[in-house]
């Protein structure tokens, strides 16, 4: 349950990026610096209908982390500001669910309407349930941020209506978290769960199965059905929005570091290059922008996770000069690739 599609194909509401920029501004980093190297415009942050690509979200997070390498808990700061009302009809659907089981089912069905990057899996036995949050599919350098953000976001958005249920089963619930205890403790004080182990390699919550099917206090079947119908409409609209951009992204990310040319992609899509260029422009992007997005994502992986040198990464990504790659990398992340690599 809850396994995510490839990041290149995922799109989320703009709300989380707006909060990210708010946190950045408070810490002295301008919005323009956070969004540089992405297809997100500052004006998009105030558009309630805007959606952003997950890869652009990851790029924005990387830029902020690169600017603030010594700031701990940025993910928790962002996630703790989330509110279900900011997610529109999906948020109201969640608040109207009859049980935690129904809530998780709805969340997975409309996962694209959330801002979550972590993968959620449910395991059940006759008496117990275990929910695991996993970020292993994300690039290593941003996993910690998204684990922090999404755990904090879950706590912040569900406490108001799930608190009575959590209090009833407090002595039967336990959690194992990879998050730093001191950073998360202020949020956990809002939740009546006392058995929490920090510093683990995974993020799991154990609770009795009876709790999963216990009625929630704000359940409203009529509101839920109305919101579900509208969520279906939103999902269909977002699917149509993916269009040709998602297809081109999938071609670029097919073989990490070996990027096809524009002509190659047009040929694979059985489309004249002029037609492909026009279709991408209609969706507000270009092959050059998408190639830059792919290169920026792969560059970080090759530097940090594969351990290649700056020269090797430059060659692998198709640059003829290391200086050209270094200039592009600094434009994407605000620091030189050599400095980024040293930070590990």
UniProtKB/Swiss-Prot annotation:
Residues 242-343 form the HTH araC/xylS-type domain. It comes from the Bacteria. Keywords: DNA-binding, Transcription, Transcription regulation. GO terms for cellular component: cytosol. SMART domains: HTH_ARAC. Residues 263-284, 310-333 bind DNA. PROSITE patterns: HTH_ARAC_FAMILY_2. The keyword tRNA-binding does not apply. GO terms for molecular function: DNA-binding transcription factor activity; transcription cis-regulatory region binding. Pfam families: Arabinose_bd (PF12625), HTH_18 (PF12833). PANTHER family: HTH-TYPE TRANSCRIPTIONAL REGULATOR GADX, HTH-TYPE TRANSCRIPTIONAL REGULATOR VQSM. This is Uncharacterized HTH-type transcriptional regulator Mb1430.
């Amino acid at each position: 349950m809850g396994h995510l599609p490839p990041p290149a194909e995922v799109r989320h509401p703009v709300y989380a990026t707006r909060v990210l920029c708010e946190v950045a501004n408070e810490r002295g980093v301008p919005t323009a610096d956070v969004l540089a190297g992405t297809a997100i415009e500052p004006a998009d942050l105030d558009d309630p209908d805007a959606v952003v690509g997950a890869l652009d979200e990851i790029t924005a997070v990387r830029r902020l982390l690169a600017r603030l390498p010594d700031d701990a808990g940025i993910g928790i700061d962002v996630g703790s500001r989330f509110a279900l009302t900011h997610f529109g009809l999906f948020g109201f659907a969640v608040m109207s669910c009859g049980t935690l089981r129904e809530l998780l089912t709805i969340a997975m069905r409309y996962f694209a309407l959330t801002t979550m990057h972590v993968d959620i899996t449910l395991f059940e036995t006759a008496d117990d349930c275990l929910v695991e949050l996993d970020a292993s599919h994300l690039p290593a350098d941003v996993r910690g941020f998204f684990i922090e953000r999404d755990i904090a976001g879950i706590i912040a958005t569900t406490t108001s209506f799930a608190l009575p249920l959590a209090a009833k089963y407090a002595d039967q619930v336990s959690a194992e978290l990879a998050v730093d205890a001191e950073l998360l403790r202020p949020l956990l004080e809002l939740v009546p769960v006392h058995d929490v182990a920090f510093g683990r390699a995974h993020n799991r919550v154990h609770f009795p199965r009876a709790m999963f099917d216990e009625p929630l206090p704000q359940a409203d079947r009529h509101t839920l059905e109305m919101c579900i119908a509208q969520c279906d409409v939103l999902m269909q609209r977002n699917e149509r929005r993916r269009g040709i951009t998602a297809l081109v992204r999938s071609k670029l990310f097919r073989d990490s570091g070996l990027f096809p040319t524009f002509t190659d992609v047009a040929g694979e899509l059985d489309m004249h290059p002029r037609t492909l260029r026009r279709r991408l422009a209609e969706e507000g992007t270009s092959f050059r922008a998408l190639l830059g997005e792919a290169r920026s994502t792969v560059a970080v992986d090759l530097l940090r996770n594969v351990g290649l040198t700056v020269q090797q990464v430059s060659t692998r990504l198709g640059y003829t000069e290391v200086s050209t790659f270094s200039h592009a990398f600094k434009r994407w992340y605000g620091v030189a690739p050599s400095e980024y690599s040293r930070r590990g």
